[in-house]
A protein has these predicted regions:
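Leucine-rich repeat
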Residues: 64-68, 74-77, 94-100, 104-108, 118-126, 128-134, 155-163, 182-189, ...
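Solenoidal tandem-repeat scaffolds enriched in leucines and small polar residues
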Residues: 184, 188-285
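N-terminal adaptor-interaction module of cullin-RING ubiquitin ligase components
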Residues: 1-155, 161-162, 178, 203
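C-terminal capping region of solenoid repeat domains
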Residues: 1-54, 63, 76, 251-395
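Long hydrophobic alpha-helices with heptad-repeat/coiled-coil character
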Residues: 155-186, 260, 272-273, 379-383
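Flexible interhelical turns and helix-capping residues at alpha-helix boundaries
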Residues: 85-88, 188-191, 347
Length: 395
């Protein structure tokens, strides 16, 4: 039989519930209102089934600092850091002051590869301050930050750089390149290929590197007579010089041929095209001054004739000669070059003519290298090394 609820009966139940609530002790009430602790739980990976497991509490905290001074010797920490690449080393330096001081040691920053990176000017100077010796900035973009008027700029000390590759680098402001060159007075190798305008002030800073051996200025622009004279008058230990396609004026070409250092072993003076100053007389002047030349590139110098080959043959150490697209030279004169290892004449003769040269000039190799490697930082299989100096970490 169904039970019938009357209004009086409902009021009786509410009164009964109130009496039970009032009879509850304060301790029971606080227990009921307490929320469960969710932090010890975590969701485990798996299928659609939701499983929650209780996390095991860690051991009692200890006051021992296992990485503090005196526990692990500093020499051991230096050894550990020597196996880290630059990215992991920076992460380690951000953990504590001790690791930051250890990570700043110059032994970890002897070389650095920033190929194609976007980097601020202040960050680049901070890297140079860590006494980097070999720095690759090929195709990098260097930006300039905007600082408030009250910002205190740090004093830029002389850099320890010996090998610097800034080929195809992009500078937001030409003054950035000048600031970098102002810090570098001990360079052994420098590449400014495709770096845009090289003014007289930059040439003066380059000239301060009196021990410079490799200098690549290919496709740079705006060289003045004063700038080129400053460089060639101071850098008398140059072994490899590349000034191809630099759009030199006639006066600058004459001065360059007169001031080339006798120490040169590899020279690229290509791309003068129809400049009348790049003639047989200046080729004679080059051969008389630089008698130790082992490789000479005169490609796209269309004014020179076969008469210049008489002077080239006097270079006893010459092993590689490139005269590609020198249309003013009579092809029959090529047969007089008997003592070369490599002879590049791209665009001067036909395919049949190449076969004739290979048979008549044997064992000279014909048309082996279409691109010049004179003073070029990366050459051959070492795509991350510059002038045979490594720039890449082990991993």
């Amino acid at each position: 039989m169904d039970q019938t609820y009357s209004p009086g009966h409902m009021s009786y139940e509410l009164v009964k519930a109130d009496e039970d609530f009032l009879s509850t002790t304060p301790s029971d009430y606080s227990i009921l209102r307490r929320r469960p602790e969710t932090s010890p739980y975590y969701r485990t990976p798996g299928p659609a089934i939701s499983r929650f497991l209780r996390r095991r509490y860690s051991v009692e905290p200890t006051s021992s600092d296992y990485l503090g001074n005196g526990t692990i010797p500093t020499t051991v920490m230096y050894k550990i850091c020597s196996y880290l690449n630059k990215k992991d080393l920076l992460h380690l330096m951000s953990t504590c002051k001790r690791f930051r001081d250890i990570g700043k040691d110059s032994s970890f920053w002897q070389f650095l590869n920033l190929y194609g990176k976007h980097i601020s000017c202040s960050s680049l100077h901070a890297i140079i301050d860590r006494k980097v010796q070999v720095l690759r900035l090929n195709s990098a973009t260097i930006n300039v930050e905007v600082f408030p008027p009250w910002h205190n700029f740090p004093i830029l000390n002389p850099a320890m750089l010996t090998h610097l590759d800034m080929s195809s680098s992009k500078f937001e402001n030409p003054s950035v390149l000048l600031e970098i060159l102002q810090r570098c007075h001990n360079l052994y190798a420098l590449s400014l290929e495709l770096c845009g305008i090289i003014d007289d002030q930059m040439c003066k800073e380059i000239a301060k590197n009196t021990n410079l051996y490799f200098l690549n200025l290919a496709m740079a622009k705006s060289f003045s007579a004063e700038g080129i004279v400053t460089i060639l008058s101071s850098c008398r230990k140059l072994g490899e010089l590349n000034i191809g396609w630099t759009e030199l004026s006639g006066d600058v070409i004459n001065l360059t041929c007169q001031l080339l250092p006798p120490s040169l072993k590899r020279l690229s003076f290509s791309g003068t095209r129809d400049k009348a100053e790049m003639n047989d007389d200046n080729i004679k002047r080059i051969c008389d001054t630089c008698k130790q030349l082992e490789e000479l590139d005169l490609s796209d110098d269309v004014v020179i004739t076969e008469n210049c080959l008489d002077h080239v043959k006097n270079l006893k150490n010459l092993r590689i000669l490139t005269i590609s697209r020198c249309y003013g030279i009579e092809p029959m004169a090529f047969l007089s070059l008997q003592n070369l290892d490599i002879f590049n004449v791209y665009g001067c003769v036909t395919v049949e003519g190449i076969d004739v040269l290979r048979s008549r000039l044997r064992p000279t190799r014909i048309n082996v290298s279409p691109l010049s490697s004179i003073a070029i930082p990366t050459d051959g299989e070492s795509v991350t090394s510059i002038w045979k100096k490594r720039t890449r970490d082990w991993y």
